[in-house]
Amino acid sequence: MTKPVIIGIAGGTGSGKSTIANAIQENVQQEITVITQDSYYKSFDNLPLEERHKINYDHPVSLDNELLISHLQTLKNNVPIEMPTYDFETHLRNKKTLTKNPSKIIIVEGILIFENPQLRNLMDIKIFVDTDADIRILRRIERDIQERGRNLHSILKQYRETVRPMHIEFVEPSKKYADVIIPEGGHNKIGIDMIVTKILSIMED
């Protein structure tokens, strides 16, 4: 089996990274393995819940990038991995893992995947999804309430204190590492078509 093509999709919270990943999957029509950086938060099980709530989860140090890099290298060698799962209400890693099998295309997506040089160097194509801040915060509110058991007050507090400052410090500057920048929150058909063409070209080489 040939080495897989690894595609990195970065962008701010709520920018449309999953939309791009789904669009690639629909258009390439190949089996795709999707790895989410959100699954690789460190498990701060040595701290009480109150202290875990205070951790800045938008800073790179909150992520277990060492494990993520190791897993991507393993997949690149055509070996399955056990991807961790994360409980966003307790801020702990679950005991349950998800088996991820290697495929011709591997997508890794997350807000900080371009911030780490070792992680960047594993990627064949780097995509940054560029979306206005007001749209991103609205999407984050909707997601965190529906999927992560959060309330509006805590979401807005986190946005002011960590999400926005960390976006300015780490996420936005990482845009310079992208091969392709897609505006309009992932709903850019021309941009997606160009990416799909490039992926197919790499796979044919």
Question: PLM features: residue spans?
Answer:
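ATP-dependent NMP and nucleoside kinases share a basic, alpha-helical "lid"
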Residues: 94-147
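Short hydrophobic/aromatic beta-strand immediately N-terminal to the Walker A/P-loop
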Residues: 6-8
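P-loop (Walker A) phosphate-binding loop of NTP-binding proteins
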Residues: 12
